[in-house]
Amino acid sequence: KHIFPLPVRGYNYSYKGTWGASRGWGGRRIHEGTDIFAGYGTPVLSTSYGVVEVMGWNQFGGWRVGIRDHHNTYHYYAHLAYFNKELKVGDIVEPGTILGGVGSSGYGKEGTSGKFPPHLHYGMYKFNGRTEWAFDPYPHLLQWEKQTKQERK
């Protein structure tokens, strides 16, 4: 079971497929995810069951949470404004667990914020025991958004 990473009712958000678009900050690289633009502080929800593997600062992603699900897919939630204070590394989460809030953190040293509009950067990575690679989350987000809206009528 999966759900959309933001509430589908009561909050405005927008997103489109930007997988592979170039990124300039911190050197040339490609966009490994989907940006979901929303108001500052909009709740960010776990899309799946999994274990909190990482919480903290990353110079690119700012305040971020990483969750590994039972299919060994790593779900990356970045640019957060804050974390759920009850959450810690090693915790088991389920779809809908609040991880934090949408923000604009990142692109600099710890605490840097406001270099871009508030949004959730959502990424998905697969690991086969040797290498990890990113794949486009956009088709999954479209499906999960539709399912979440149907379930929450």
Model-derived segments and their meaning:
Residues 46-89, 108-119:
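Zn2+-dependent peptidoglycan hydrolase active-site motif and core
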Residues 39, 85, 126:
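Generic anion/oxyanion-binding catalytic loop in active/binding sites
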Residues 66, 91-152:
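Conserved, short, structured surface segments that act as functional micro-motifs
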Residues 5-8, 28, 59, 86, ...:
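Extracellular/periplasmic catalytic domains that process cell-envelope and extracellular macromolecules
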